Amino acid sequence: MTQLKNPVLMATIGAAQGLRGEVRVKSFTDDPTALGDYGNLHSEDGRVFEVLEIREAKNVVVVRFRGVNDRTAAEALNGLELFIERDNLPDDDLDEDEFFYADLEGMEAVDRTGKSYGSVTGVFDFGAGDLLELKGPGLRPVLIPFTEWSVLEIDLEAGKLVIDPTAAGLVDDEKSGPGKPFPTKRK
């Protein structure tokens, strides 16, 4: 199999489930049970996985893939990431202001003056809302909230996000002056 040109991470395989080759899968799709609707899934090493059965379980889905017929084969897949080609995502179903998180990666984050704050290297959800990871040349990665206050505009065609650096926590409010560290306790 050839490598995917524009891979999108769809799921990560977890532990084996039962004896018939089923695995627990963390799906990154809006509807976890729709994982098989995007066509065959691919691993980074070139293997192809076809979803035969899928059902919901606690916080994951349980999946049976073609050719994975016993627990030993299922256990060998633990930790494997599964991808599809970006072109397999259904753009026709999106509203004008909707997009896929995969489309944000690589976009440059700029403020209204055009100053760059780096490029989006990841989109994360740790439970309290989505975060964008930004990384600029020679800079440490930073996380900013993916909210309408922090991200003012998304221009997919230009490959840019317009952000409010103050709302994103990248700079202090100009009125308050330079940031001060937390006071230390006196003994």
Curated annotation (Swiss-Prot):
Q: Which domain of life is it from?
A: Bacteria
GO terms under cellular component: cytoplasm; ribosome
Which residue stretches, if any, does this entry annotate as coiled coil?
none
Alphabetically, the GO molecular function entries are:
ribosome binding
Where is the protein localized? Cytoplasm
Determine if Cytoplasm is one of this entry's keywords.
yes
* Classification via InterPro entries: PRC-brl_dom, PRC_barrel-like_sf, RimM, RimM_N, RimM_N_sf, Transl_B-barrel_sf
**Domain PRC barrel residue range list:** 96-169
The domain section of the record reads: The PRC barrel domain binds ribosomal protein uS19.
Q: Which family does it belong to?
A: Belongs to the RimM family.
Assembly description: Binds ribosomal protein uS19.
This chain's function reads: An accessory protein needed during the final step in the assembly of 30S ribosomal subunit, possibly for assembly of the head region. Essential for efficient processing of 16S rRNA. May be needed both before and after RbfA during the maturation of 16S rRNA. It has affinity for free ribosomal 30S subunits but not for 70S ribosomes.
Q: What is this protein called?
A: Ribosome maturation factor RimM
What's the encoding gene here?
rimM
